Amino acid sequence: DEDVMNIIRVEKPVGVVVAFGGQTAIKLTKHMAEHGVNILGTPPDAIDAAEDRERFDELLEQLKIKRPQGFTVMTCDEALEVANKIHYPVLMRPSYVLGGQNMIIAFNDDDIKEYMAIILDQGIENPVLIDKYLMGTELEIDAICDGEDILSPGIREHIERTGIHSGDSIAVYPAWNVSDSLINRIIECSKKLAIALNTKGLVNIQYIAYHDEIYVIE
Protein backbone atom coordinates (compact mmCIF):
# COMPACT_ATOMS: atom_id res chain seq x y z
CA ASP A 1 0.00 0.00 0.00
CA GLU A 2 2.71 2.45 1.00
CA ASP A 3 4.79 1.76 -2.13
CA VAL A 4 1.83 2.46 -4.41
CA MET A 5 0.89 5.65 -2.57
CA ASN A 6 4.49 6.88 -2.74
CA ILE A 7 4.45 6.47 -6.52
CA ILE A 8 1.10 8.26 -6.77
CA ARG A 9 2.39 11.19 -4.70
CA VAL A 10 5.40 11.55 -7.01
CA GLU A 11 3.64 11.00 -10.35
CA LYS A 12 0.40 12.85 -9.45
CA PRO A 13 -1.74 10.95 -12.00
CA VAL A 14 -5.15 12.14 -13.15
CA GLY A 15 -6.45 8.77 -12.02
CA VAL A 16 -5.62 5.09 -11.65
CA VAL A 17 -6.93 2.15 -13.69
CA VAL A 18 -7.08 -1.05 -11.61
CA ALA A 19 -8.50 -3.38 -14.28
CA PHE A 20 -5.09 -4.54 -15.54
CA GLY A 21 -3.42 -5.34 -12.23
CA GLY A 22 -5.15 -8.57 -11.29
CA GLN A 23 -6.29 -9.24 -7.74
CA THR A 24 -3.49 -7.16 -6.21
CA ALA A 25 -4.81 -3.99 -7.83
CA ILE A 26 -8.39 -4.87 -6.92
CA LYS A 27 -7.42 -5.22 -3.25
CA LEU A 28 -5.70 -1.81 -3.33
CA THR A 29 -8.75 -0.03 -4.75
CA LYS A 30 -10.46 0.71 -1.44
CA HIS A 31 -7.20 1.91 0.16
CA MET A 32 -6.44 4.26 -2.73
CA ALA A 33 -9.98 5.64 -2.84
CA GLU A 34 -9.88 6.36 0.91
CA HIS A 35 -6.69 8.36 0.32
CA GLY A 36 -8.29 10.52 -2.36
CA VAL A 37 -6.98 8.73 -5.45
CA ASN A 38 -9.30 9.03 -8.45
CA ILE A 39 -10.22 5.49 -9.56
CA LEU A 40 -10.94 5.55 -13.28
CA GLY A 41 -13.62 3.27 -14.69
CA THR A 42 -15.75 1.10 -12.42
CA PRO A 43 -16.35 2.85 -9.05
CA PRO A 44 -14.71 1.35 -5.94
CA ASP A 45 -18.10 0.64 -4.34
CA ALA A 46 -19.16 -1.35 -7.42
CA ILE A 47 -15.96 -3.39 -7.24
CA ASP A 48 -16.67 -4.12 -3.57
CA ALA A 49 -20.24 -5.14 -4.44
CA ALA A 50 -18.89 -7.69 -6.91
CA GLU A 51 -16.33 -9.04 -4.41
CA ASP A 52 -18.47 -9.05 -1.24
CA ARG A 53 -20.47 -12.29 -1.06
CA GLU A 54 -23.52 -10.89 0.76
CA ARG A 55 -23.81 -7.80 -1.44
CA PHE A 56 -23.31 -9.83 -4.61
CA ASP A 57 -25.90 -12.43 -3.55
CA GLU A 58 -28.42 -9.65 -2.92
CA LEU A 59 -27.77 -8.27 -6.40
CA LEU A 60 -28.15 -11.68 -8.03
CA GLU A 61 -31.44 -12.19 -6.21
CA GLN A 62 -32.72 -8.81 -7.42
CA LEU A 63 -31.73 -9.70 -11.00
CA LYS A 64 -33.14 -13.24 -10.67
CA ILE A 65 -29.79 -14.79 -11.61
CA LYS A 66 -28.91 -18.16 -10.08
CA ARG A 67 -25.73 -19.12 -8.26
CA PRO A 68 -24.74 -22.32 -6.41
CA GLN A 69 -25.97 -22.42 -2.81
CA GLY A 70 -23.22 -21.08 -0.59
CA PHE A 71 -22.18 -19.25 2.56
CA THR A 72 -19.24 -17.37 4.05
CA VAL A 73 -17.35 -18.61 7.10
CA MET A 74 -14.54 -17.42 9.34
CA THR A 75 -13.87 -20.51 11.47
CA CYS A 76 -13.43 -24.25 11.02
CA ASP A 77 -16.59 -25.02 13.02
CA GLU A 78 -18.62 -22.71 10.79
CA ALA A 79 -17.13 -24.36 7.70
CA LEU A 80 -18.06 -27.84 8.92
CA GLU A 81 -21.59 -26.73 9.75
CA VAL A 82 -22.10 -25.19 6.30
CA ALA A 83 -20.59 -28.15 4.42
CA ASN A 84 -22.86 -30.61 6.19
CA LYS A 85 -25.84 -28.33 5.62
CA ILE A 86 -25.44 -28.05 1.84
CA HIS A 87 -23.88 -31.56 1.55
CA TYR A 88 -20.58 -32.66 0.03
CA PRO A 89 -18.81 -32.10 -2.28
CA VAL A 90 -18.31 -28.37 -1.69
CA LEU A 91 -16.08 -25.75 -3.29
CA MET A 92 -13.92 -23.72 -0.91
CA ARG A 93 -11.93 -20.57 -1.67
CA PRO A 94 -10.95 -17.28 -0.04
CA SER A 95 -13.07 -14.24 -0.91
CA TYR A 96 -11.57 -11.28 -2.77
CA VAL A 97 -9.53 -13.66 -4.94
CA LEU A 98 -9.90 -14.00 -8.69
CA GLY A 99 -9.71 -17.09 -10.84
CA GLY A 100 -9.89 -19.76 -8.17
CA GLN A 101 -6.57 -19.24 -6.42
CA ASN A 102 -6.26 -21.41 -3.28
CA MET A 103 -9.48 -23.17 -4.27
CA ILE A 104 -10.24 -26.80 -3.40
CA ILE A 105 -13.06 -29.29 -3.71
CA ALA A 106 -13.79 -30.78 -0.28
CA PHE A 107 -15.37 -34.22 -0.10
CA ASN A 108 -15.47 -34.77 3.67
CA ASP A 109 -14.90 -33.20 7.09
CA ASP A 110 -11.17 -33.99 7.02
CA ASP A 111 -10.75 -31.94 3.82
CA ILE A 112 -12.51 -29.02 5.51
CA LYS A 113 -10.33 -29.22 8.63
CA GLU A 114 -7.10 -29.41 6.63
CA TYR A 115 -8.02 -26.49 4.36
CA MET A 116 -9.23 -24.23 7.16
CA ALA A 117 -6.08 -24.96 9.20
CA ILE A 118 -3.95 -23.74 6.29
CA ILE A 119 -6.08 -20.63 5.66
CA LEU A 120 -6.31 -19.68 9.33
CA ASP A 121 -2.57 -20.16 9.74
CA GLN A 122 -2.04 -17.55 7.00
CA GLY A 123 -4.01 -14.99 9.01
CA ILE A 124 -7.51 -14.73 7.59
CA GLU A 125 -8.77 -11.22 6.81
CA ASN A 126 -11.72 -11.95 4.53
CA PRO A 127 -14.28 -14.76 4.83
CA VAL A 128 -13.86 -18.14 3.18
CA LEU A 129 -16.50 -18.94 0.57
CA ILE A 130 -18.15 -22.37 0.62
CA ASP A 131 -20.42 -23.30 -2.29
CA LYS A 132 -22.26 -26.45 -3.28
CA TYR A 133 -20.05 -28.08 -5.94
CA LEU A 134 -21.83 -28.55 -9.26
CA MET A 135 -20.20 -30.93 -11.73
CA GLY A 136 -21.06 -28.89 -14.79
CA THR A 137 -19.36 -27.07 -17.65
CA GLU A 138 -17.46 -23.93 -16.66
CA LEU A 139 -17.90 -20.99 -19.02
CA GLU A 140 -16.27 -17.58 -18.96
CA ILE A 141 -17.06 -14.29 -20.65
CA ASP A 142 -14.88 -11.19 -20.97
CA ALA A 143 -16.52 -7.95 -22.00
CA ILE A 144 -16.16 -4.20 -21.94
CA CYS A 145 -18.98 -2.00 -20.68
CA ASP A 146 -19.66 1.73 -20.92
CA GLY A 147 -22.37 1.69 -18.25
CA GLU A 148 -25.15 1.29 -20.79
CA ASP A 149 -24.19 -1.61 -23.02
CA ILE A 150 -21.58 -4.35 -23.25
CA LEU A 151 -19.38 -5.68 -26.04
CA SER A 152 -17.88 -9.17 -25.82
CA PRO A 153 -15.71 -11.08 -28.31
CA GLY A 154 -17.28 -14.35 -27.17
CA ILE A 155 -17.55 -17.07 -24.53
CA ARG A 156 -14.81 -19.52 -23.54
CA GLU A 157 -15.50 -23.08 -22.43
CA HIS A 158 -13.13 -24.61 -19.86
CA ILE A 159 -11.94 -28.14 -20.60
CA GLU A 160 -11.06 -29.01 -17.00
CA ARG A 161 -13.76 -29.68 -14.45
CA THR A 162 -15.07 -26.79 -12.41
CA GLY A 163 -12.98 -26.04 -9.36
CA ILE A 164 -9.64 -25.78 -11.17
CA HIS A 165 -7.76 -22.46 -10.92
CA SER A 166 -8.54 -20.64 -14.18
CA GLY A 167 -4.85 -19.84 -14.65
CA ASP A 168 -4.16 -23.59 -14.80
CA SER A 169 -7.12 -24.38 -17.05
CA ILE A 170 -7.31 -24.94 -20.78
CA ALA A 171 -10.26 -23.28 -22.48
CA VAL A 172 -11.60 -23.37 -26.02
CA TYR A 173 -13.00 -20.42 -27.91
CA PRO A 174 -15.72 -20.22 -28.96
CA ALA A 175 -17.62 -22.53 -26.59
CA TRP A 176 -18.57 -25.61 -28.61
CA ASN A 177 -20.52 -27.81 -26.21
CA VAL A 178 -23.18 -25.32 -25.15
CA SER A 179 -26.61 -24.70 -26.64
CA ASP A 180 -27.55 -21.40 -28.26
CA SER A 181 -30.19 -20.83 -25.59
CA LEU A 182 -27.58 -21.06 -22.80
CA ILE A 183 -25.21 -18.76 -24.69
CA ASN A 184 -28.00 -16.21 -25.07
CA ARG A 185 -28.77 -16.55 -21.36
CA ILE A 186 -25.11 -15.90 -20.48
CA ILE A 187 -25.08 -12.78 -22.65
CA GLU A 188 -28.34 -11.59 -21.06
CA CYS A 189 -27.11 -12.20 -17.49
CA SER A 190 -23.74 -10.58 -18.20
CA LYS A 191 -25.37 -7.43 -19.53
CA LYS A 192 -27.70 -7.23 -16.51
CA LEU A 193 -24.82 -7.66 -14.08
CA ALA A 194 -22.44 -5.26 -15.78
CA ILE A 195 -25.02 -2.48 -15.95
CA ALA A 196 -26.36 -3.10 -12.43
CA LEU A 197 -22.80 -2.81 -11.09
CA ASN A 198 -22.24 0.42 -13.02
CA THR A 199 -19.26 -1.16 -14.76
CA LYS A 200 -17.07 1.19 -16.78
CA GLY A 201 -14.39 -0.81 -18.53
CA LEU A 202 -13.46 -4.48 -18.40
CA VAL A 203 -15.61 -7.16 -16.80
CA ASN A 204 -15.06 -10.92 -16.39
CA ILE A 205 -17.85 -13.27 -15.30
CA GLN A 206 -17.59 -17.02 -14.77
CA TYR A 207 -20.54 -19.38 -15.02
CA ILE A 208 -21.43 -23.05 -14.65
CA ALA A 209 -23.82 -24.75 -17.06
CA TYR A 210 -25.53 -27.49 -15.06
CA HIS A 211 -28.65 -29.44 -16.04
CA ASP A 212 -29.49 -26.85 -18.71
CA GLU A 213 -29.31 -23.98 -16.23
CA ILE A 214 -26.77 -21.18 -15.83
CA TYR A 215 -25.21 -20.38 -12.44
CA VAL A 216 -22.82 -17.52 -11.69
CA ILE A 217 -19.58 -18.52 -9.95
CA GLU A 218 -17.91 -15.11 -9.75
What are the residue ranges of the model-derived segments?
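N-terminal beta-alpha lobe that positions the nucleotide/phosphoryl donor
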Residues: 1-205, 209-218
